[in-house]
Amino acid sequence: MEPSKLFTISDNATFAPGPVNNAADKKTFRTCFRILVLSVQAVTLILVIVTLGELVRMINDQGLSNQLSSITDKIRESATMIASAVGVMNQVIHGVTVSLPLQIEGNQNQLLSTLATICTSKKQISNCSTNIPLVNDLRFINGINKFIIEDYANHDFSIGHPLNMPSFIPTATSPNGCTRIPSFSLGKTHWCYTHNVINANCKDHTSSNQYVSMGILVQTASGYPMFKTLKIQYLSDGLNRKSCSIATVPDGCAMYCYVSTQLETDDYAGSSPPTQKLTLLFYNDTVTERTISPSGLEGNWATLVPGVGSGIYFENKLIFPAYGGVLPNSTLGVKLAREFFRPVNPYNPCSGPQQDLDQRALRSYFPSYLSNRRVQSAFLVCAWNQILVTNCELVVPSNNQTLMGAEGRVLLINNRLLYYQRSTSWWPYELLYEISFTFTNSGQSSVNMSWIPIYSFTRPGSGKCSGENVCPIACVSGVYLDPWPLTPYSHQSGINRNFYFTGALLNSSTTRVNPTLYVSALNNLKVLAPYGTQGLSASYTTTTCFQDTGDASVYCVYIMELASNIVGEFQILPVLTRLTIT
């Protein structure tokens, strides 16, 4: 290798051009300097980055703060507007649900009061079409068809002694006469009543007439009410009207009957339903009667029977209870084929395989006594504004919600609809439902039924369907004993036990004897007040309660069919009592 031109090598190991220590020191210094410069630059860069980041953050925070401030302001504005709107809505809701109804009711009462004042008859001048207006005493108007108890608290009851008043129900006048099947409806302005007057003992398939009356509630000098009869119609035209239901309507009464001169069993055995009659009786003595053919009747029903219990005037419609025999192979019969309702008393259940009990419950709708027809409940619904020109419709509830069809009553209390169904089949307890209708201008209307579980007492029944039986079986038994609810029923858990109702029961499990006034809760009787002597025979009972808003007294009229040893088999008696609630 060629020697370096920069160095002179000798044995003394010396270098040219200068000393080795100076060069090394300079190199070390340069390295340190460079490291220092790079470090300073790095630190500076980091500081710049941090500073820029902080500036960006501050800028962003300021913008976000401004945005949040703007949003907060808008939320506050919206909250103010919502609060204002809610305040207005609360005023509207209170006005519509509380103030307006009270004002309307007050105006109505004022109008009725004015009518009662100006509608008088003097010796020379009469300013009315009739001497007495068809308007109840103002003390009672506001206490009719209202729940007597609005809370769900525990209460005690006392049924007073029967009050002495003139009976508004005439009796038979011969030993072989018979008055039966009372139907009573109390409206805000007046009441309507009807019963059947049978010419040959109590065989209603032969020949009978129909007694109809209307009147008002007035206060007697004794302080308690009296049912003052203002109009009477006695329908004696050769038609054998049966099982009539009555309803109060504007200025009069509406009555739904069917006409038949054969046995009930023969009606069910046939295939063509008997004549259906709708009769309108007004305070001006006008009587209009129509033969109706409700939609869904022909081809589906072997027979259709009014429910006996009263109907209602509701939302410009006339609604009556009905029941009858559905032809199994008809359109309606096929639709209902597999439907059944089997209530259970948890305190006294029926034992056995569930599937077997369900099958027996289904078969109970087809009693052989009534030619194996499906015995079905229904409602006759008629549009009031076209009552003279259009037919009515039959609205049929699902049998998944109701027991076998039977006599019944439709109640309207505090604008809530309830339906009593006679316990004609195997179930021995009172049957009461809350109901709601869905009406349509075209097509089929519908009804929903919600059973109210009552287990406090049973009706008398015969054979295997006595009051002690709680298991499904096909039978036709029982008796009509409608209740009057004193409180609204609530589905809220824990308060249902304080649902109270009153009526007249027959205190026997097998025989129609021992009429007894009662007040009951769902599961137990609160008060029992026997009427008459032990063993007294009785039959149908219907009950209506109302309040004297002048002194807050509560009255109930229990209309009962009682045995008579003097005139006829039964005498229909209205028993008026004061009900004390504490």
UniProtKB/Swiss-Prot annotation:
<feature type="glycosylation site" description="N-linked (GlcNAc...) asparagine; by host">
    <location>
        <position position="507"/>
    </location>
</feature>
<dbReference type="GO" id="GO:0019031">
    <property type="term" value="C:viral envelope"/>
</dbReference>
<feature type="site" description="Binding to the glycan motifs of the host receptor">
    <location>
        <position position="369"/>
    </location>
</feature>
<feature type="disulfide bond">
    <location>
        <begin position="192"/>
        <end position="253"/>
    </location>
</feature>
<feature type="site" description="Binding to the glycan motifs of the host receptor">
    <location>
        <position position="422"/>
    </location>
</feature>
<dbReference type="Pfam" id="PF00423">
    <property type="entry name" value="HN"/>
</dbReference>
<keyword id="KW-1160">Virus entry into host cell</keyword>
<comment type="similarity">
    <text>Belongs to the paramyxoviruses hemagglutinin-neuraminidase family.</text>
</comment>
<comment type="function">
    <text>Neuraminidase activity ensures the efficient spread of the virus by dissociating the mature virions from the neuraminic acid containing glycoproteins.</text>
</comment>
<dbReference type="GO" id="GO:0016020">
    <property type="term" value="C:membrane"/>
</dbReference>
<keyword id="KW-0378">Hydrolase</keyword>
<dbReference type="GO" id="GO:0019062">
    <property type="term" value="P:virion attachment to host cell"/>
</dbReference>
<keyword id="KW-1043">Host membrane</keyword>
<keyword id="KW-0945">Host-virus interaction</keyword>
<feature type="disulfide bond">
    <location>
        <begin position="244"/>
        <end position="257"/>
    </location>
</feature>
<dbReference type="GO" id="GO:0046718">
    <property type="term" value="P:symbiont entry into host cell"/>
</dbReference>
<feature type="site" description="Binding to the glycan motifs of the host receptor">
    <location>
        <position position="407"/>
    </location>
</feature>
<feature type="glycosylation site" description="N-linked (GlcNAc...) asparagine; by host">
    <location>
        <position position="448"/>
    </location>
</feature>
<protein>
    <recommendedName>
        <fullName>Hemagglutinin-neuraminidase</fullName>
        <ecNumber>3.2.1.18</ecNumber>
    </recommendedName>
</protein>
<keyword id="KW-0812">Transmembrane</keyword>
<keyword id="KW-0325">Glycoprotein</keyword>
<dbReference type="GO" id="GO:0004308">
    <property type="term" value="F:exo-alpha-sialidase activity"/>
</dbReference>
<keyword id="KW-0735">Signal-anchor</keyword>
<feature type="disulfide bond">
    <location>
        <begin position="465"/>
        <end position="475"/>
    </location>
</feature>
<keyword id="KW-0472">Membrane</keyword>
<keyword id="KW-0261">Viral envelope protein</keyword>
<feature type="glycosylation site" description="N-linked (GlcNAc...) asparagine; by host">
    <location>
        <position position="400"/>
    </location>
</feature>
<comment type="function">
    <text>Attaches the virus to alpha-2,3-linked sialic acid-containing cell receptors and thereby initiating infection. Binding of HN protein to the receptor induces a conformational change that allows the F protein to trigger virion/cell membranes fusion. Binds to the glycan motifs sialyl Lewis (SLe) and GM2 ganglioside (GM2-glycan).</text>
</comment>
<feature type="topological domain" description="Virion surface">
    <location>
        <begin position="56"/>
        <end position="582"/>
    </location>
</feature>
<dbReference type="GO" id="GO:0020002">
    <property type="term" value="C:host cell plasma membrane"/>
</dbReference>
<keyword id="KW-1133">Transmembrane helix</keyword>
<keyword id="KW-1161">Viral attachment to host cell</keyword>
<comment type="subunit">
    <text>Homotetramer; composed of disulfide-linked homodimers. Interacts with F protein trimer.</text>
</comment>
<feature type="region of interest" description="Involved in neuraminidase activity">
    <location>
        <begin position="240"/>
        <end position="245"/>
    </location>
</feature>
<keyword id="KW-1015">Disulfide bond</keyword>
<dbReference type="GO" id="GO:0046789">
    <property type="term" value="F:host cell surface receptor binding"/>
</dbReference>
<feature type="glycosylation site" description="N-linked (GlcNAc...) asparagine; by host">
    <location>
        <position position="329"/>
    </location>
</feature>
<keyword id="KW-1032">Host cell membrane</keyword>
<dbReference type="InterPro" id="IPR016285">
    <property type="entry name" value="Hemagglutn-neuramid"/>
</dbReference>
<feature type="disulfide bond">
    <location>
        <begin position="178"/>
        <end position="202"/>
    </location>
</feature>
<feature type="disulfide bond">
    <location>
        <begin position="545"/>
        <end position="556"/>
    </location>
</feature>
<feature type="site" description="Binding to the glycan motifs of the host receptor">
    <location>
        <position position="242"/>
    </location>
</feature>
